[in-house]
Amino acid sequence: MNALPTPKSYGWHSRGYLPHFDGGSIPQSITFRLFDSLPQSVLDQWSHELSLQAEADREAELRTRIDAYLDKGYGSSYLRNNSVATIVQDALLFFDEQRYLLSAWLVMPNHVHVLTTPLPGHPLSKIMHSLKSFTSNEVNRILKRSGTLWMPDYHDRYIRNEKHFAAAVTYVENNPVKAGLCKRPSDWKFSSAWFRAQGE
């Protein structure tokens, strides 16, 4: 990516969970997770422990704790199943260059990281709703289960500049190495690093 796209802002919105910034053609780093990957009681405890910190420090520390917890692979970890991970990865790739530009992605056992730039006319909120709805139906079908698959919300962070973009790619692709699941980013099959290593 040689230059960041010209912003076309849709503004802030919230469904009552996390506030989101639909920034139009601004790259955004997204994390969404399985419904049982992180108990609400743990989040509540962390929020209480961090309540006296400044807001910026509190949010940064909470994000660090969440990421570390997710990397331990708690919960059902349905995405550890290759067929399930394939459904999610294929869904991400399907609308690349149609609804968004997909720069990096990673399907971990209980969560997914995506670095993407929504294309004009495709707000991030609608992209995420479509992606989670489709994959939930398909995964439930092959696992012969019903009910909730994903947490209803997602964490998003817009990319400020080229340096931040490069750091986000590295963070996403290095996640399975950091979690002790493989030795190199390109060893993890359900990732942009693996695809790039295959020349795809």
Question: What function would you assign to each model-found segment?
Answer:
Residues M1-E200:
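Short catalytic/metal-binding and nucleic-acid-binding patches
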